[in-house]
Structures are given as structure tokens and as C-alpha cells.
Amino acid sequence: MKNEKRKTGIEPKVFFPPLIIVGILCWLTVRDLDAANVVINAVFSYVTNVWGWAFEWYMVVMLFGWFWLVFGPYAKKRLGNEPPEFSTASWIFMMFASCTSAAVLFWGSIEIYYYISTPPFGLEPNSTGAKELGLAYSLFHWGPLPWATYSFLSVAFAYFFFVRKMEVIRPSSTLVPLVGEKHAKGLFGTIVDNFYLVALIFAMGTSLGLATPLVTECMQWLFGIPHTLQLDAIIITCWIILNAICVACGLQKGVRIASDVRSYLSFLMLGWVFIVSGASFIMNYFTDSVGMLLMYLPRMLFYTDPIAKGGFPQGWTVFYWAWWVIYAIQMSIFLARISRGRTVRELCFGMVLGLTASTWILWTVLGSNTLLLMDKNIINIPNLIEQYGVARAIIETWAALPLSTATMWGFFILCFIATVTLVNACSYTLAMSTCREVRDGEEPPLLVRIGWSILVGIIGIVLLALGGLKPIQTAIIAGGCPLFFVNIMVTLSFIKDAKQNWKD
């Protein structure tokens, strides 16, 4: 019994440091919100202006790595000896499901407004040129380039899982080929794992901070309940309690069903928006935006704006590249696990084509709808943001559609389910990563899962208390900095080990 308790207990060296670090940062922030905002602005400015170029080069180098995998010596190598675990259709559907989070619904609905009102390349705000580039930039930030970087890491993790038969729940275990077993399991590996966990906690808290206001604004629209910070906190608390009940009562099957419902409802809601908002315009705008993307792609890839200093690449491109970096390990582990039995080329092409199609559909439909509503003066997004906040502006883009009550109910259910599954996934991932020798498929301890969901909820509330998007953007960028190096080390470790052990 003692051995079993030890086996399923927490791993102190990766449990307590992230808990203490995040706890102290939350306490300091709540203690003085104004001072915290000053620090946040300073951190954001320093990282994006001084080191933004590094994130851009990281994405470009990883893109070349994708081409090397697709056309290089490992292209036909199979990730495991078994046939593919899922059919190609199911595999692609599972990829799409991973893209339909509430945070994605947040950015997909409002991102184009920011690109048009504060455009790149010195364009006039709200001009024709700004509108032509609006969706093109969304397709750039959520298109083949970032998914290609995830492909490389997914191949790396799939190689360690299915070829080398390694149990990987933290990144340090993949670094043995690069730094040796002594360092990977010693202080160096512990530091790497703690960087990963702190960044992941902030990323998940950020996603919760984006998702919660959408649900509470829906509640205000549907039920007339005023949206306040207290309501946000109550809703987050309810999600944590619901997650605890699901885990304690063995309702994980219900959570998985909810995840499937989320995916199907996403298809339904996107189809509805596509039909009623203007299918012809959406297809024309998408086609034109692909052309604009191809025309401006070299500039977008390397745009740092050092002369004009307009701030667009720092505020958006660097932010989004940090977003992709911070979620890379967690997402790549998931994508690797569902790709057993596929070749390297299949995985790389499947991810880039399938996931790009998913994100492009989301951003095209939601972004085009927002642009149409702005052009027709149906909603005034600047006034809505100034008076009520970003979440209200997003809600109004949905409420302006025909059959508004039914549409809002659909959006409310979608956001609620998406956030329930988010909290569940957060608690599971963090508990798995901070427990001792919990194997894949096993359940980590209940109290550990509840504890992490509470901490993630607290971070979400703190970010909401700070107000605005800058704290959320800064949390992502600050967390992305250490993972920038961790991702590179995982990649190099895979290349070194594959060169030695993955021969014909």
C-alpha cells in the first residue's frame, strides 16, 4: 500500500516550485493592481521589442525543419509498428476538436477589428488596404506556419513514445539523448520541467481569463444578470466544483461526450454564421485574403517594424508566436498520441492540411461576419469595447445574427462546454505532470487535480481583475520565453537520437 501511495503521490521537485512561484506572483499582483499593470507593460515592451526577432526566426527555422521531415530521410519512417489507431477521418476530426476552445472563439470573433483599427505597414486605420489585410493576417497567424512548427515537435514526441517506447509526461525525459541521463534526471531536468509547468499554468489561466467573460456576457444577454468580476469568480468556482464532481464520481466519460458535443456544435454554429451572414462575401473575402497572404508573406515573416515603431508585430505577431510556443509541448504530446502508426510524412501533411483547414474556417467565418457588421454599421465595436469591454463586443457580433435568441443560446452552450472541458484538461495535464510515475491512461490523484484547477481559476480571476488584453498578452509572452529554449532542446534531442537509432 505504501508503494502504491508513493507511486501515485506528488513529485515535490516539480509540484511545489511552480505552486510557490505562481502563488507569489498572484499575491503580489492582487496586492497592488496598478503597480502590477506598470510592471506588465514594462515586461511586454521589453520582451517584444528586444527579443521579438527571436520568435520570428524560431518559426522560420521550424518551417524549414518541417520541409526536412517531409522530404528528408525520415519521411517514410513509421511512428510505431502498429497500424494507425484511428481512421484518417477520425484523426482529422480529433484535430479539429482540439481547435474549438473558447479562447479560439474569442480571438476569431474580434481579432480582425484590431487589425483593421491598428493596421500594419503604416496603413490608415479602417482603410480599404487595412480591411484587405485584416483576414490575411489572421490566416498568417493561424495557418500553415505555426502548425508546421507543431508538426516537428509532434514527430519528436511520437518518436519517443512509439519508436523509443519512452514514458513522457514532462519534457525533461526527452532530453536524455541531448544532455545525458544524469542531467536530464537531475537539477537541469528539474529546472526545465518547472519552466514548462509555470508557463503552462499561466497559459491555461489565460485561456480561462478569455473564456469566462464570454459566458458571463451571454448570461447577461440571456438572463439579464449584470456582468461583474464577482460573477466571473462565481462562474469559475462553479466550473472547478463541477470538474471535481466529474472526477470524483467517475464521470470522465461524460466529459469526453461533452467534448464531442462541443465539436459538433462548433460545426453547427459556424455553418449557421456562414449561411446567414453572407456566404458569397465570405468566400470572396477568403479568396482575396489568401492572395494578400501570398503577396505579403515574406514581409509578414520578418516584420519587426524597427523604423516606424508602430507596434503591430510586437503586439500581435510576437504575441501569437509566443502563444504557439507556450502550448507547443502540451498540444504536440496530444497530437503525437493520436498519430501512432502513421509515417512522418503523413503526420506532417495531415497536421498542416487538417489543422490549417480548421483554423482557417474558424477565422474566415467569424472574422468576415465581424467585418460585415462593422461595414453595415450594425454594431459599433470601439464604443462597445470602451463602455463594456471586449467580451461584450464579441457577444454583440453573435447577437446581431438572425434568430438572435437561439443563436445566443447556441453560443452560450458552446462556450460553457468548451470551458468545462478546458478546466478538466487543465487539471488533468498539470496533475499528470506533477505526480510521481502516473502512467498514461491512469488517473492522477483527485486532490491534486482539484488543487491545480483552483490555482488556474485564481490566475484567470487575477487576469480579469487587471482588465484589458495587455495582462493576458504579457502572461503568454513571459511564459513563452523559457519554453522557447525548451522546445529547441526537445527538437535537437530528437534529431540527435534519431540519427543514431532510427536507421534502415
From Swiss-Prot:
User: Per its record, what are the GO molecular function terms?
Assistant: (R)-carnitine:4-(trimethylammonio)butanoate antiporter activity
Q: Which InterPro entries match?
A: BCCT_CS, BCCT_transptr, BCCT_transptr_CaiT
The Gene Ontology CC terms held by the record are:
plasma membrane
Keyword Cytoplasm among record annotations: no
Location relative to the cell: Cell inner membrane
- Reaction catalysis annotation: 4-(trimethylamino)butanoate(in) + (R)-carnitine(out) = 4-(trimethylamino)butanoate(out) + (R)-carnitine(in)
Recorded metabolic or biological pathway in which this protein acts:
Amine and polyamine metabolism; carnitine metabolism
Q: Which residues form a coiled coil?
A: none
Q: Which Pfam families match?
A: BCCT
The record gives the membrane topology as: Multi-pass membrane protein
Q: Which NCBIfam families match?
A: bcct, PRK03356.1
Record text on subunit structure and interactions:
Homotrimer.
The record, for PANTHER family, names: HIGH-AFFINITY CHOLINE TRANSPORT PROTEIN-RELATED, L-CARNITINE_GAMMA-BUTYROBETAINE ANTIPORTER
The family note in this entry says:
Belongs to the BCCT transporter (TC 2.A.15) family. CaiT subfamily.
Give the matching HAMAP family: CaiT
The protein depicted here goes by the name: L-carnitine/gamma-butyrobetaine antiporter
Species per Swiss-Prot/TrEMBL record: Escherichia coli (strain ATCC 8739 / DSM 1576 / NBRC 3972 / NCIMB 8545 / WDCM 00012 / Crooks)
Underlying gene? caiT
